[in-house]
Amino acid sequence: MGFGDLKTPAGLQVLNDYLADKSYIEGYVPSQADVAVFEAISGPPPADLCHALRWYNHIKSYEKEKASLPGVKKSLGKYGPVSVADTTGSGAADAKDDDDIDLFGSDDEEESEDAKRLREERLAQYESKKAKKPAVVAKSSILLDVKPWDDETDMTKLEECVRSIQADGLVWGSSKLVPVGYGIKKLQIQCVVEDDKVGTDMLEEQITAFEDYVQSMDVAAFNKI
């Protein structure tokens, strides 16, 4: 497993392809897996790698909280496509298999205090989730206006970047280009979000992060479903 050398364009391309249908390196929330890969990259990916750039900017916003993100940080070779080997020079040794936390770990293996605490916390969370009854999910339909810099902006690429933003509770809908004057067109795009998972602030932060294409974003319409 791995991404190749994340300090090279080839490695970043592998990362971009890997994130084309994923919001995070593992699972549905930021974790130590994202931190490990983020720290292996020397800087923001180029704008044409929109999936990798979207992920990079999102994880960067967790800079102050990265130590508290869930999971156990492992070596880069533990993440990414199975068919690619990690060759990023990090100087860090691979994490030992004994460090992996097994939710149903064997009783006859010695556990560190941290590992034992983490396993107990996960078991408690699992039991808590199982006990909860399904709640009604509040959703909203949002119409966004995404404005380019000028009439030379590649609107196809702009829309591709916007749609590359993925999150649990976010579904993109139809879109169209609307003239605003002087040959400039804005992207008007519909999306449906789960209110407790996705907000307009998060959408604006991630969309405007594609600063090579996007000048600004506005909410044109907002309706509860």
From Swiss-Prot:
The keyword Repressor belongs to this UniProt entry's keyword annotation: no
UniProtKB keywords: Acetylation, Elongation factor, Isopeptide bond, Phosphoprotein, Protein biosynthesis, Ubl conjugation
InterPro entries: eEF-1beta-like_sf, EF-1_beta_acid_region_euk, EF1B_bsu/dsu, EF1B_bsu/dsu_GNE, Glutathione-S-Trfase_C_sf, Transl_elong_EF1B/ribsomal_bS6, Transl_elong_EF1B_B/D_CS
Modified-residue entries (Phosphoserine), positions: S42, S83, S106, S174
GO MF: translation elongation factor activity
This protein's record includes keyword Acetylation: yes
Cross-link (Glycyl lysine isopeptide (Lys-Gly) (interchain with G-Cter in SUMO2)): K147
Any single Gene Ontology cellular-component annotation: endoplasmic reticulum
Post-translational modification remark: Phosphorylation affects the GDP/GTP exchange rate.
Pfam families listed in its UniProt record: EF-1_beta_acid, EF1_GNE
Modified residues (N6-acetyllysine): K7
GO biological process: response to ethanol
Phosphothreonine found at: T88
Domain GST C-terminal: 1-85
Function in brief: Catalytic subunit of the guanine nucleotide exchange factor (GEF) (eEF1B subcomplex) of the eukaryotic elongation factor 1 complex (eEF1). Stimulates the exchange of GDP for GTP on elongation factor 1A (eEF1A), probably by displacing GDP from the nucleotide binding pocket in eEF1A.
Family per similarity comment: Belongs to the EF-1-beta/EF-1-delta family.
Assembly: EF-1 is composed of 4 subunits: alpha, beta (alpha subunit of the eEF1B subcomplex), delta (beta subunit of the eEF1B subcomplex), and gamma (gamma subunit of the eEF1B subcomplex). Interacts with elongation factor EEF1A1.
The name this protein goes by in its record: Elongation factor 1-beta
Organism field: Rattus norvegicus (Rat)
Gene (UniProt): Eef1b2
